[in-house]
Amino acid sequence: MSDSAYTLAELLIAAGSEAWRGDGEVLATGIGLIPRLAASLAMLSSSPDLMMTDSEAYLLSEPNPVGGRGADFRPQYETWMGFSRIFDNVWGGKRHAMVGPTQIDRFGQANISCIGDPAKPKAQMLGVRGFPGNSISHANSFFVPGHNTRVFKAGECDMVCSIGYNPARLPKGYAVAEIDIRLVVTDLCVMDFGGPAHQIRLRSLHPGITAAKVQENTSFPVCVPDDVITTPAPTEAQLAIIRRLDPHNLRSREIKDNPPGDRR
């Protein structure tokens, strides 16, 4: 555990990096700053065999830092990684993405497309993008910077972009056992879908957060085991890596007010 002060953003990056632990040589994709830093931290610590691109066309042997890098910065290019090779990994199941849905329901289905009736939405967002194919092809984890009942929605998502553990929504030929949702990292806790019948399950509570607060901010029942732990603080080594990867502290803008990671 770290003796240094750490922020909530840093706690979430360290917690998010655990999603890739033990993955081996798969393409790690973090969509958004916190997931990207989490994937980069994993590559530089617990999961050195991960593959990561520069978000353009090259595979890196070391993650690029975020923000301005200076004229003398030289990316650690390893080889070309164009779209054809990206999709070889996607369709072959050799990828693990962490994404940020706008809505998640009790099945683990996710939405980034629209809010309200899709025929007449209250708000139009990105569209389904790559969510349908990703959800049937490889492992996925979720990042939620603001855990509330609007995100963790009662019933089903307004638009199911990413399938989950709902047999009624599975494409022909797919089984629930083939769906692979790993971690759900929020500003309150870490969860997964390892409860009874793939119910969402609490894995750890961030320091100062209670299970009651998590349930209060989730519109469907959360499985709370007897052995829920406190989310581990980032280690000194992890904090050093995070601060090297994000020298301009862009992470502080990703979480509202970015409070201390320990809120006791």
Regions found by a protein language model. Give the residues of each.
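Charged/polar, solvent-exposed surface patches and flexible loops
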Residues: 18, 40, 89, 216, ...
